[in-house]
From Swiss-Prot:
Disulfide bonds: none annotated. Keywords: Ribonucleoprotein, Ribosomal protein, RNA-binding, rRNA-binding. Gene3D superfamilies: 3.30.70.60. This is Small ribosomal subunit protein bS6. InterPro entries: Ribosomal_bS6, Ribosomal_bS6_CS, Ribosomal_bS6_sf, Ribosomal_S6_plastid/chlpt, Transl_elong_EF1B/ribsomal_bS6. Belongs to the bacterial ribosomal protein bS6 family. It comes from Psychrobacter cryohalolentis (strain ATCC BAA-1226 / DSM 17306 / VKM B-2378 / K5). GO terms for molecular function: small ribosomal subunit rRNA binding; structural constituent of ribosome. GO terms for biological process: translation. It comes from the Bacteria.
Amino acid sequence: MRHYELVLLVHPDQSDQVVGMVERYIKLVQDNNGTIHRLEDWGRRQLAYPINKIHKAHYVLFNIETDGETLAELEELFRYNDAIIRSLVMRRDDAVTEESQLAKNADEKRARKATTRRPDSNDDNDNHSDD
């Protein structure tokens, strides 16, 4: 079995359907003795250029280990699913299990946002003293 990295761009109007679609693709891979090494939902992002007058898409990344027949079946499902506006399949030498740079950056951004304290309007009232 070979290792593959798949990126799907889903129509933004179908973002709520992504979970069900991903579950179907995972089930197909696992039913054919494949393995999911990494799954990341990057959410809705701006496209570099419009595709069919669409400016945003919902991105999903998979790293899988599967055989050629299952991969061909997945690609056919992607091709005939109108909700998927683009798909990319790359063969990898090894299984990639670590978090992608995009996901790491998003985690760091969330952590910075959580540690940044916003001034509270009640703090000004707590500092006065009664004379």
